[in-house]
């Protein structure tokens, strides 16, 4: 949680001088139950704990938006699958890779999606790209 606390502090400072900010990467937090293949199974566990989600909500409360959720998305879209459980093949994923954009960029964001194409490679990552398009 220390990392999230430090990120929150950094973003508070950055927003004082720049209103166009993108924060992206592997947050290791599924923002909501709809970002988890089986919310009951993951309830309270790492990646889905109340504490982790609380810190993410604090960051969002600064004026950031989860860009993926700006657009209507079909259910069951994830960015990470555990190798140990053959989770990709079983559609047992979580959306833990996020692109957060500041309020000033919301109108510029015209698309947000997850590209599962790399998962078809011979030795893929356990994560797949999350992308946005800004105009």
Feature locations, PLM:
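A long, amphipathic alpha-helix that forms part
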Residues: 1-18
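Amphipathic alpha-helical interface surfaces
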Residues: 3, 7, 23, 52-55
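Metal-dependent phosphoester-hydrolase catalytic domains
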Residues: 13, 33-135
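Acidic/histidine-rich, metal-coordinating catalytic segments
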Residues: 19-33
